[in-house]
Each structure stands twice: as C-alpha cells, then as structure tokens.
UniProtKB/Swiss-Prot annotation:
Residues 90-101, 256-285, 336-349, 866-884 have a biased composition (Polar residues). It comes from the Eukaryota. Residues 28-40, 123-143, 350-363, 912-922 have a biased composition (Low complexity). Belongs to the cytospin-A family. Residues 961-1066 form the Calponin-homology (CH) domain. This is Cytospin-B. GO terms for cellular component: apical part of cell; cytoplasm; cytosol; fibrillar center; membrane; nucleoplasm; nucleus. It is found in: Nucleus. Keywords: Coiled coil, Lipoprotein, Membrane, Myristate, Nucleus, Phosphoprotein. The modification Phosphoserine is found at residues 38, 55, 76, 111, 133, 136-137, 360, 365, 368, 424, 847, 863, 912, 914. Residues 1-163, 192-223, 250-375, 831-922 are annotated as: Disordered.
Amino acid sequence: MRSAAKPWSPVAKAGSHGPDRTRPLPGTPSGMKSSKSSTSLAFESRLSKLKRASSEDTLNKPGSASSGVARLKKTSTSGAISELTESRLRSNTGTIPTTKRTGIPAPRELSVTISRERSVPRGPSSSKKLGSSPTSSCNPTPTKHLRTTPAKPKQEHEGAEKAVLESQVRELLAEAKTKDSEINRLRSELKKCKERWALSTEDANASDPSAEGTASPESDAQPLIRTLEEKNKTFQKELADLEEENRALKEKLTYLEQSPNSEGAASHTGDSSCPTSITHESSFGSPVGNELSSETDEYRRTTHGSALRTSGSSSSDVTKASLSPDASDFEHITADTPSRPLSATSNPFKSSKGSPTGSSPNNASELSLASLTEKIQKMEENQHSTAEELQATLQELSDQQQMVQELTAENEKLVDEKTILETSFHQHRERAEQLSQENEKLINLLQERVKNEEPSAQGGKVLELEQKCTDILEKSRFEREKLLNIQQQLTCSLRKVEEENQGAIDMIKHLKEENEKLNGFLEHERCNNSVMAKTLEECRVTLEGLKMENGSLKALLEADKQKAIEASSTVGQTAENFEVQEMLKVARAEKDQLQLSCTELRQELLKANGEIKHVSSLLAKMEKDYSYLKEVCDHQAEQLSRTSLKLQEKASESDAEIKDMKETIFELEDQVEQHRAVKLHNNQLISELEGSVIKLEEQKSDLERQLKTLTKQIKEETEEWRRFQADLQTAVVVANDIKCEAQQELRTVKRRLLEEEEKNARLQKELGDIQGHSRWVTGRATLLPVNEEPEPSEADAAGRWRGVYVNRTSPAPSDSATTVKSLIKSFDLGHSGGTGQSISVHKTPRSPLSGIPVRTAPAAAVSPMQRHSTYSSMKPASKGTSQRLDLPDLPLSDLLKGRAEDRKSDPYLRKSPSLESLSRPPSLGFGNTRLLSASTGGLKPSKLSVERRDPLAALAREYGGSKRNALLKWCQKKTEGYANIDITNFSSSWSDGLALCALLHTYLPAHIPYQELNSQEKKRNLLLAFEAAQSVGINPSLELSEMLYTDRPDWQSVMQYVAQIYKYFET
C-alpha cells in the first residue's frame, strides 16, 4: 500500500510476528497542492482494480479474505533475509560497527536513512513548486524476524534453486517498478504542463501580446521532452549497472554458500539480493529519487558528510537495516490506490485528532531515533536469547544422540541376553516337564501299590515307619550328645596339650640360654689355655738355653780346675799366681750365682708343668660336661618336638571329626535350602525375563512410532517444499503479468501525452482567436477549472484513502491468522493433533532459502523472541500512547492490541505469554519424543535413564521441550509476582543479580531483603545471592567480576548455577 509522502526518518514499528524492524520513509519534497483531472483519476482507479484482480486471482487461497499485505508474506520474508546477509557482507567497510560473529544471526544494526531531493528543470514562466505523486512513496509492511537454521550440505542444491527463483522474481519486480516510476514521472510532467498552460493563459490575458503567450508553452514542452529522453537513457544505464551489480552479489552469495565457514552465512542466504531492490526503490520508487546520480551524490555529501558513503547507482552503500522492498513492491502494485495531492493529513507524526499543525521534523527525528535505539536493544536481546536457545538445543540434541547410541548398544546386549535366557528358559521348562511326568508316574505307581495292599498291612507299615522315625530321631539325638561330649573332651585335652607345649617351649628357651652361657665360658677357657701354652713354650725355650749355658760353664769349670791343679803345682811362682787365685775366686762366685739361678729356674719349670697339667685336666672336664649337656638338650628337644607333633595331629584329627559330624548333620538342610533358593532364583529369572521382553516390545513399538512420525515429517516437509516452489512459480507468473501491464500503461500514458500535446497546440490556436474578449470573461473562464476541479478529485481521493486506511488498520484477526497458518502449515507438525492448543499469532516462521523448516522445541511454542515482541507490542497499548504511529502499518496490530487489553488485568502475565497461550502440554516433537514415549509406556527407568544423569530431565518432561527452556519456565514461574524481573534468557536477564535474589528469596526470605534491592546495585545483589546460596551449601560457580563488568555473562555458567539451585531445593 502507498501512503502520502513522509519525512525520511527511521520509524520503528511493533510487528506481530517478530522483533521490531526499522524502515526508511520517503522524504517530503517541498511543494504545494496539485490538482488532478477526472480522466486521470478514472484511469488510475481502473488500472488499480485490474492489478488487484490479477493479484487476487493468482495469490489468494481459499478461506483468506485479508488484504494484499497478508497475501505477500513470503516475498517480505525473503527480502528480510536478503537484507541481513548484505548487511553482514558490508559490515567490514567501516560505516557502521559490526557485532561479533558467533555462527548465529547477529542483532541488526541501526539503519541509516538518507533524505533526497531533486532539482526539477522549470520553464521561465513557472513560479510554483511541483508536488510529488503520493503513489511513488511506499510504506513497507513489517516483516518477520527469522531464526533460520544453518543450511545442511544436502540442501545446497535446493537453496541454489530457491535463490535463482527469488532473483528472477526480484528482477521482474524491479523492472515493473521502473515502469511504474516512469508512469508516475509522466503523470507529474502532465500535471506540470497543465499548470503551466493555466498560468500562461492567465499571463496572456493579463498582458495582451499573444505571441509571447503562444511561444512559451511550445518552448517549455520541447526541453521537457528532451530531458525526459535523457533521463530515460540514464535510467537504462543505471538499470544495466544494477543488473551487473546484482550478478556480482549473486556470485558472492554462491561463494559464501560453498565456503566451509558458511554456517553463519547459510542461515541468511538470499540476503545479497536486498541491495538491488533497495537501490531500485531509491532510484525509482518516488519522484524524489528520480534525480541524476551526480546530483544525488552532491546533495548527500552536503547533507550527511563523510559518515554516510552513498552512491546513486551502487547498492553497497544503501541503508543496512531497511525492510525488504519486495513486499512493498507487491503491495503497491497489487493494492495500489489512486494518487492524491499532498495534504496535511498525510503526515504520520500528526496528533490523533488530525490537526493541521503536525509535530516538527526535529521532534519526529528525535522520536524515531529514540524508538530505533529501543527497538535495536530489544532486537539484540532477542537475538542473544535465540542464540542461547539454539546452543542449548544443539547441546541437548548431541546428548540425546549419545543416549540413543548407548540405548541401542544396550538394546543389542539385552537382545543377546534375551536369546540366552530364552534358550535356558526352554531348557528349564523341558526339564520341569520331564520331572513332572516322572513325578506323575511315581504317584501313579504309589497309588496302585496302595490299592493292592490291604488296609491292615498299610496300618502296620505306618506304625513301623513311625517307630523307625522315632528310633532314628533318638539315635540322632544320642549321637549328637556323644559328639558334643567328645568335642568338649577334645577341647579340654587340646587346651592341656597346648599348656604342656607352652611349658616345653619355655624349657627349651631356658636350656638354649644356658647352652649359650656355657659356650661363652668354654670359649673364654680356650683362650686362656692358648695363652698358657704359649707361656709354656717360652719357658721350654729358656730352659734349653739355660741347659746349654750350664754345659758351657761346666766345661769352663773343668778347664779352670785343671789350671788350678797346674797352678797348685807351681806354688812357688811369683805374683802371677796371686792373680790366678783372684780370678778363681771370681769364677767361684759366679759359679755360685749361676747355680742359684739354675735352681730357681728348675723350680719355676716344675710349677709351670703342674699348672699345665691342672689346666688340661680342667679342659677335659669342661669338654665332657659340654658334650653331656648338648646330648641332654638335643634329646629333650627331640622329645618335645615329637610330643608337639603328636598333639597337633590329634587336634587336627579331632577338628576334622567335628567338622565331618557337623557337615553330616547339616548337609540335608543345606541341600533343601539350596534347592529352594535355586527354585526361587529360577522363578525370579523367569519373571524378569518376561518383564524385559515386555519392555523390549514396548520400546520397539515406541521406536516404530518415532520412525513413523519422522517419515511423516519428512514427507510433509518435501510436500511443503514443492508447494513453495509452486508459489514461487506463481509469483514469477504474476510478476510477468505485472510487467506486461506496466508496459501497456507506459504505452497508454505516452499516447495520452501525445494527445495532450496536440490538445495543447489546439488550445493555443483557440487562445489566439479569443484574445479580443474582455479580461473579466477570460479570468472567470480560466478560474472555474482551476477552483472547481480539485474538489471532486480531492474528495474522491480522500474517501478512497480513508477506505484504504481503514482496510490497512483493521484487518480481521481470523483472516490474518489463517493466512499465516497457510504460509507455515507444515512447520507445526507437533501441534497439529492438539485440539487444546491455541497458538494462532505466535507461529514459527520458516526461511524460504533453507530446505528444512525452522523448528523450535515443542514446549517452547512461543520463543523468547516472540514473547519479547509481544511484550513490546503490548506495552504501548497499556500505556495509552498514540495509536497512529503503530496501527497504519501493521496488518495484525488490532489483534495484538486486543490481546494486550485482555491481558492488561494481570500485570505479571507479560513475563511469560507462552504459558497462557498453551492450554495443555504439547504433543510429541523431535526433542522429547523418546522421553514422553517412555513415560507414557509406564517403563521403569534404565541405568542410562535421564533422571540419573541429570535431574533436569524430570523438569523438561514436566514442562516439555528442552532442559534449558524448562528451567527458564521454572524460573519464570518461581519469580512470578516480583517487580523488575523479566527472565527471557540465561545471560542478560541475570546480570544485575535481581533475578537470582528473587529466585533465592522464594526459598530463603530471611537471607535476602528483596524490597530494599534495586537493579543499579549489581555488586550488592550478587553478593547477597551468593552468600544466601552458600549458606545452604551451594558453592558459587559464577565469577563476580564477570557478572559485574559484563552485561552478558556466559549463559552456560549461569544456567549451571541456577540448575544447582533447582537441584538443591527441588530434588
């Protein structure tokens, strides 16, 4: 749909299906009211009816009665996707700061809008500014923010086919847009000609010379035609440049899709086609954009400076976050209304009463910038929450895949065990049958014998058997008592033998000590004996020496005696004899001394011999004693060892006898108990086997059911892909029809221009004929068409515009819901069977460039992004702001307004609208099919059960969906009723600490004064929460510095900490 010309300023609108998007509004050229002839109005109305009829025939589906806005959601979503990739591709140029790429869709940047004006060549006699055609300004509808999944390698071929089809559609739309712009330009030129002709007739009547009056229109018409031809050529050149640029962007897109790091880019395939359509819109969408590229560049440089690098023909410098022009093209082509002159009512920033004095452009720009910043923050918040949700679902999917693998391995093991147990069960059953048959045979034989025997004999036998039993019992008791007495005697004898053994051991120890003492004394005596033998040998040597000396002395004595005899014979000698006598005296004295010493030595020798004899006798005695003692000790040791061995043998024999008797006593009882235990064990095994067989059959049925659902989903997705291809083909056909219509309109308008030029020449000739009349007649004749013609045209246009305005602002909610449902019918397979689910507005969109639909977890039927968008759309309604800023451009605004007014009574309902929209738990989806099937089947959890590995599995089964979404819903439910708490993710919602304090306040109100807290004191809030949790034994796994200095802490660590709180208080 098209509205009147509006100032170029980014205005954020609250959409009903996604986050808020920014859009550029066309600029307001300075001008005044221009009139339209009744013929042009009739022609335009007929032309719009034809377009509307053709578009409704090709695009309307049965049951949809909404306007063209709701019928063309697919092209709008494809354009929105194409924008995001182009903004990613151009994020490195430096004009706008980019965000950190994480492989998931990044939040959208602030849109940069450019106001444009064009200088129109005027004739010398034109003194008024020209008005712009309102049909050239387009008002795009809000599109959905898509959460696209990364494209898989299987679907690259399908994505390429989609991209080709969409590029064809956009090229056709661009061509139709160029034709439409040419039609609008020709209309404006026609209006200019009429105005100039009216002014020239007035000037000609005022000043009588007719030559100047007739020459001016002719001189003005020729340069106009030339300028039109030149502009047409320039537009064709620009169109060729844009086509080349579009081809280059397509090559970039295919390169990005084929690159290995295309996970982030594949989720936004098709974005590269956005600049072409945006550039077409900026070049051809309105007469403001019809100027030459050089004039546009100069004006942009002077207006915006070096911050905005713009170009008239380059698509790389167009605004990044503007909405997709494809949806607006379809709208203003299929639901075009006749253009009307500019009026004060077309200002979107007027008050609700429609006063002619609207708000100033500065206030409008400030309002738009404030709303843009707010919406961009919300978009970033939603983007991070979706990224967090995607990562959590991916982790849980990988865990579930591992669990499936483990369960399949365990299932195989169970199957093997089942086969083994079945074989053993069959063997036991056969054995039991054989035993039962034998038992029956024996019973039959016993019954036959009983029948054959007489009753008296039977009674005697019974008495004999009873007597035998009593005798056996008495014997067994007597033997038992005997055995007990024997056991007591043996124990007593064993104790005595042990005491004797202990005494013998002590005696042996004492004898060993005495033996050691005697050995020491013997060694000492031996040492003394060796010393005495040495001294004896020395004495013997000295005795031999003395004997030799004695012999020599005897020989000397004999010699001296002979000399004395000779001397005595010679008595009469002289003094010599005297000397000999003295010498004899000396010799005699020495002889006496030697004799004394010899006698002493003989006495000592005798003493030494006596001592030697005495010591040898003692030594012999000691040796005899030692040998005797040794023999006695050895004999005693042998006796003690023999006695100990005998005692040990007796004790072992007695123990063996006791054990044998005990074993014989309790043997039968053990056998009976073993038999009973084996029987019970076999019965338990049989029951367990039957239970495992039932479990395996139920698991098999569950797996078959899952396989059927998956095959059904695949079939429905393929059918939906075929439907989408058919829709694209119909869109191509419609675009071709529109192109043909635009070409026909162009030819008709050119024909009308020639007719008007001929009529203008004819009127100029008539003007020369009636120049002789008076001035008041000519003035009245010229004023009548000027003053009377605008009234019906303005009234008609205003009436039509009001009709279009009402049609835009108040669509039927059921129609919009059914249209959205028809577009995304195959994406809610998990919810199709539920009659109690009423999710009509919050539908999950799908990407037209991805082969599989965008699916969320079954429990998270309303994602945090959609909740945020719903809250952002409900908030203005509850505060009572002006509805003129939101309603004219939103096809589902009335529906959201009604939902917001219904929920206004509950102030805390806006925290979790998904809980209200779901009336019962969702049906089976892809993530929780195995868990729900296991719980409905009534099976006991196995050793790989989710509850054992993670207590959050029970919470996920209670709330449905993934563990992350279940824990998030639990947090929302626990903190419901607390002020300033809005939990939508596990990152930014917990950064100020209020959410943690509120969650812990529900369990520990004495530890946390929640009424005194505010969101500005982050450190206090976090310290209070950590201390309260630590007081009950929950260790703080979060870092205080990370929580304080980052607005978005790590969501996994926050989720782990919240899970610890849940496990402590809830499990």
